[in-house]
């Protein structure tokens, strides 16, 4: 049996895996255990009551968290003309068309989010094999293919998170940093859960938000009592 690290021993002693914690208690526990030499991210896993094998029950979308994610997001925009100027004014880090596509083909991808106007998809479409595996391919379902590129840039910069269930029907995303206040993490989590409720597939039956767990980058998951959250859409 593998030897437990000191940190893992402490986590095992502190975290009751059979318990659902009130949100403020859960955050306090995470912050106590976030002892890495860097500021750890706070991540969430939401088990959904869906059959992920059925395409009509898959959940995908994006929402802006009220307090952002604590990360500085670099945004690349494929567009031209007046939209290019609007994107730059909105804070886009890189704006272009064929020239930007050439950078991507060379592996020069110093950005976290890609936005495209519909007329640019003829260029972006050629980059699917590069952007797709990295989760960077623009998609109208998450608002990154849009005629209003300026709004998409502002949303990305403001801390928009994209979500998509995995094959087990679980959503994984980041909702902040370990140095956020408990209230900031709570409000970010509530905003995400409200967005997920709105995205519930009509064919999904029974309890939709089955389990909510939060963790830090290097820590264990802590189950959250949903009764301690305000998720009224």
From Swiss-Prot:
Instruction: Give the InterPro entries listed for this entry.
Output: Ribosom_uL1_bac-type (IPR005878), Ribosomal_uL1 (IPR002143), Ribosomal_uL1-like (IPR023674), Ribosomal_uL1/biogenesis (IPR028364), Ribosomal_uL1_3-a/b-sand (IPR016095), Ribosomal_uL1_CS (IPR023673)
For this record, the Gene Ontology CC terms, alphabetical, are: cytosolic large ribosomal subunit
Among SUPFAM superfamilies, the record links this protein to: Ribosomal protein L1
* Keyword check for Ribosomal protein: yes
A Pfam entry, by short name: Ribosomal_L1
Give GO MF terms, alphabetically.
rRNA binding; structural constituent of ribosome; tRNA binding
Which keywords does this chain's UniProt record carry? Repressor, Ribonucleoprotein, Ribosomal protein, RNA-binding, rRNA-binding, Translation regulation, tRNA-binding
Record's function text: Binds directly to 23S rRNA. The L1 stalk is quite mobile in the ribosome, and is involved in E site tRNA release. Protein L1 is also a translational repressor protein, it controls the translation of the L11 operon by binding to its mRNA.
Q: How does it assemble?
A: Part of the 50S ribosomal subunit.
Q: Which HAMAP family match?
A: Ribosomal_uL1_B
Question: What name does UniProt use for this protein?
Answer: Large ribosomal subunit protein uL1
Organism, by scientific name, is Vibrio campbellii (strain ATCC BAA-1116)
